[in-house]
Curated annotation (Swiss-Prot):
Family: Belongs to the QueC family.
Pfam families: QueC
Protein name per its UniProtKB record: 7-cyano-7-deazaguanine synthase
Highest rank taxon of the organism: Bacteria
Source organism of the structure: Psychrobacter arcticus (strain DSM 17307 / VKM B-2377 / 273-4)
């Protein structure tokens, strides 16, 4: 697992340079939802790896206009793109897949001092999709094996988050350990890593990173209940974090809002 920590010595800088050179000969799989974080990860991976495959999921989400965004983003970036069908919606348990449930309004101040290791059940919103990241990463792991990729890139963060347990560093570390125990690649010495370049970045810092890499955030859809045209509701948790991020970064928000 990796983060965005900077090297602290000349030896660290030399090791970092050698690692970057190694990565340029390797391939990566990027989980691409069509949102702000995942497109930043896509461009981050493009700058580091020889070949990148983007993977998106049609899982019965109410905001499936994000898949249209993901397709356009992948085409703009010039990367291979796979959309995988998984019917998670039949399981229920989330307002993102169950239309009888209400998507709550966002509140960026609801966890001002709470760290990820202090998350409790009351802090997990109903937009959490049961086991979603585990399911997505498992499919990405299979794609990594068939595309001879050493890395899977996912846009989880420990700074700006919605209280999801499957975005924590310890979860990512555990999945990476499992991946190297449970795959042909892992047991034959081809180490698989889960890369989390946004893990320690706020939404504002993520936006700054993306802009430095050439990301067009006008293509992205973050909203949990975007309409068929991709217009965002402006009030859900994801919209609240996105609005806050652009404001803190001092950058104009290119999002099309419903009102």
């Amino acid at each position: 697992m990796t983060n965005t920590a900077l090297p602290t010595s000349s030896a660290d800088q030399e090791n970092d340079t050698q690692l970057n050179e190694l990565h340029k000969s390797q391939n990566a799989v990027v989980l691409l939802s069509g949102g702000l974080d995942s497109v930043t990860c896509l461009y981050w991976a493009k700058a580091r790896y020889a070949s990148v495959t983007a993977v998106s999921f049609d899982y019965g989400q109410r905001h499936n206009s994000e898949l249209i965004a993901a397709k356009a983003i992948a085409e703009t970036a010039g990367v291979n793109h796979r959309i995988i069908d998984i019917d998670i919606a039949q399981l229920g348990g989330s307002s993102l897949t169950d239309h009888s449930m209400i998507v709550p309004d966002g509140d960026t101040d609801k966890f001002p001092d709470k760290k990820r290791d202090e998350i409790d059940n009351d802090a997990i919103p109903n937009t959490y999709v049961p086991a979603r990241n585990t399911i997505f990463l498992s499919y990405a792991l299979a794609v990594a094996e068939v595309t001879d990729s050493n890395h899977i890139v996912i846009g989880v963060s420990s700074v700006d988050y919605s209280g999801y347990p499957d975005c924590r560093p310890e979860y990512i570390a555990a999945f990476q350990h499992m991946a190297n125990l449970a795959t042909k690649a892992g047991v034959t010495g081809h180490h698989l890593s889960i890369q989390t370049p946004l893990q320690q970045l706020s939404k504002a810092k993520t936006i700054e990173l993306g802009l430095s890499l050439g990301v067009d955030y006008g293509q992205t859809i973050s909203c949990y209940q975007a309409d068929a045209n991709g217009f965002a509701c402006g009030v859900c948790d994801s919209c609240a974090l996105r609005r806050q991020g652009f404001a803190q970064a001092g950058v104009a928000d290119p999002t099309h809002y419903q009102s």
